Amino acid sequence: MTPSLAPRRVILPVIYGIALLIAWEALAHSGAVSRLVLAGPLEIVVAGVRNWSELGFNAGVTLAQALIGAAIGNVAGLLVAICFVHWGFFRRAVFPLAILCEAIPVVAILPVLILWLGNGMAPKIFVAAFLSFFPMLVNAYRGLSNVDEEVRELLYSYSATASQMLWKVRMPAAVPFMFTALKLSACSSMIASLVAEWLASERGLGFLVVYYGQSYRVADIWSAAILSCLISLGLYGITAACERRALSRSSP
Amino acid sequence: MRGPALSLAFEGRRPWHWMGLDIVMLNAFPDEATRVRAATLPAGLYADGIDVVFRRGSHSVQALKDCSLDIPRGSWATLIGASGCGKSTLLRVFADIVKPTAGTALLHGVSPAEARANRIYALVQQGSTMLPWRSIIDNVALGLEISGLPKSTRYARAEEALALVGLKGFEKSLPSELSGGMRQRAAIARALTLRPRFLLMDEPFGALDEITRDRLHFELLRILEETGATLLLVTHSISEAVILSDKVIVMTPRPGRISEIIEVDFGRGRTPDLRGDPRFVQYEAQLRRALHQPA
Ligand SMILES: Nc1ncnc2c1ncn2[C@@H]1O[C@H](COP(=O)(O)OP(=O)(O)OP(=O)(O)O)[C@@H](O)[C@H]1O
Ligand SMILES: [Mg+2]
């Protein structure tokens, strides 16, 4: 980012954002849309501040589920990808099955998951893990097998072991690919955790949204939704920052 | 080819156990006949009747046909010939990367697979690939890292090798910050850190300017003389072949065969003055004739 571009890259979105908020506020006050459909931004902020402790606690629950799920899903995805790289027969047998599983609409089978896992954190963690697993599997596998033929031959000429190949070549080569998956999972795991709460739960942002919805507290719903949005963005931002740090060495 | 004599001789699996190999080998056999046989094993690079056929589905390419050569230990040979005549393939047979369809290849009397397992050769590849996320010194020290040497030894040897190829000061640079020629020199340094008995080089000087190339030629020869290493080098340059060889192996394509082996009799202690020697021009002319001969 050159210095002369930096202000423009920040200022333009900010100006558009403010204009949008003003238009939104005006629309909410004009009476053209029902209060039950759309709350104004000021009203949403006020609702958020009023419910901050309730929102904070429930957001924490949802975030915890998302993080645990994402961690499990990503680690499992990476481990399976490592197995795929080393055992071709395993990959050929399992990869088609994995793709098939990915097509399962996990939200649609939530009721079954709740029957199996109860209505605590477990099914939410499962859904978040499920949605993080496949992007990591596919991306990590691509990265791990993305080894230049000459590099492979060089390591072979050194009689390198499979684990040396993995740690010294495959893993570093796969890092950019893994970050792609992590960024995907930063957003999807929060959504997964929240959506899984809709059906059966006593805590979490998803539960709050349903609870507010039942009593038509529109501004409160929006405040919960926007909070979840901000958390997702935060997770994404942290991941992207880690990515920049990790990759700054190899791509000057 | 490999009898009990070899399994005895290679009991110690590490290269440094082999330093006094010939003496150990000869003393190990009480009976005269075995001792004579052991002494006559090819200690350099040896190939007999190598065929390489690449298959892809029903389509097959004969890359090498009946290639035989014998490069004594400590001597220098170059492979030269038109593009696609199988020079890299022959080199890669010795590196155990290509398995020959038929024939025997030996390095110091052992198969390429054993030579690789014991790390007695070093390879410089045609592309001089580096790991892009590693600094130059970490790239150059990679082979030693794989062998499990301690970090201080690794770096000391890598720095030494980098200085030798004129890359002092670029230790911390990334491969992407170097020119093609500099990367090629780093790849040469990477091979030299291993202190190999056999140096297998695939067009290692291709991207270098004339002056650097000249300097590196004689630097390489000096190292080879000091270490007694055996050289097999692929080149497209006739003068390079003459400067660097005791034997120039001329190959012809379709299928790749060895058409002629020209002995270059410049001995040891070669200097850049070599180019002024009248024999140098004669060898060049002889080589050019051999290359232009229809197969
Ligand atoms: N892995 C492979 N699979 C199939 N064919 C191959 C393979 N490697 C080489 N060949 C074929 O073998 C022949 C010899 O290739 P090789 O790379 O040894 O040539 P070369 O003499 O090194 O050429 P150059 O001077 O261009 O590097 C070519 O016809 C090539 O197409
Ligand atoms: Mg080649």
Enumerate the predicted regions with their spans:
Chain B
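Helix-to-loop junction immediately C-terminal to a conserved catalytic motif
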Residues: A95
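ABC ATPase NBD coupling module
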Residues: S58, S111-Q125, I146, K151-Y155, ...
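A short, flexible loop at the N-terminus of ABC-type nucleotide-binding domains that lies
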Residues: R37-A47, V53-D66
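Conserved signature/switch motifs of ABC ATPase nucleotide-binding domains
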Residues: S173-S176, L194
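The feature captures the beta-strand-to-loop junction immediately N-terminal to the Walker
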Residues: I80-A82
